[in-house]
Amino acid sequence: MSDYFDQILKQAKQASLDMAKLTANDRSKILMNISGFLVARKQEILQANQLDVDRAKQKNLSAPMVNRLILTDTKIDQLAQDVEKIAQMADPLNQELEKWSNTTNGLQFSKVSVPIGVIGIIYESRPNVTIDAASLCLRSGNVSILRGGSECIETNRKLYECIQEALKDLQLNPYLVCFVEQTDRAYVQELLQAEGKVDVIIPRGGKSLIQTITDNSRVPTIKHLEGICHTIWDEGYPKEQAQSIIHNAKLRRPEICGATETLLIHSSHSAEDIAYVLDDLKSQGCEII
């Protein structure tokens, strides 16, 4: 293993011990601070993002790939608001999930939620994942090692600076969130081979990325593969609300892996109501097969 990645793993290990000392309120304060730094450094983030977008266009990346890269003033504001929402969530830790007893000897058992530990997150061209993933890991008391795609490295670096500044501002270990800044794919392999040092890998991206990680990881993974997201229009649901939900699910950001690809419609809906919903999609250039 390279000295560079070995250092990241050591930082993550120490950070996991420091993370265990934090209260739910401490973790909420971190997230609120991150939100504030995102807004305060918005222009720097946008400038870095423009570098990534320009480079992507020079490399003739596909339009959907370029669209995934783009951040705007509004998107950064929304990202900051999303972090605040995560900060306000109920603490997921130390919750009693199940309880039972042994009737023979009277022993009491409880299943309680605890952090996983160190989570490696590998993702492609959506820079907002840097903030989403880090925030969710912080809220749940986990240290994260983030490895984004090379196509959005400038944006990710700037976003990570916001995270580190937020942690340092609170006089906390800045490596509660770690970031693989080197874009060499060899470091992805090192992350996948870090058995015993990384507790789980969560990939977020296209089929080829997920398959590569599945085939090569010695660390347990939490993954999807094919995508093919479904939306179900069930019996008794009004066509107006169905149209709104289906429109959003498919057309809000059609280039992302979470966009609806399959629509299942209950047989009770009339042909006229179905046409009402599908015509809306067709009018926006969506092909119905």
Predicted feature residues:
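ALDH superfamily catalytic-core signature
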Residues: S125-N128, D132-V143, C162, A166-D169, ...
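N-terminal Rossmann-like NAD(P)+-binding subdomain of aldehyde/semialdehyde dehydrogenases
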Residues: M1-Q108
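Conserved small-residue-rich beta-alpha loop and adjacent elements
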Residues: K85-M89, L93-A166, L170, S217-T221
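General beta-strand structural signal in soluble alpha/beta enzymes
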Residues: L146, C178-E181, I202-G205, T221-H224, ...
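Active-site/ligand-binding-proximal alpha/beta "capping" segment
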Residues: L191-V200, D215
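Conserved acidic residues
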Residues: G117, D199, E261
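A structured beta-alpha segment of the ubiquitous adenosine-cofactor-binding alpha/beta core
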Residues: R68, T72, T104, Q108-K111, ...
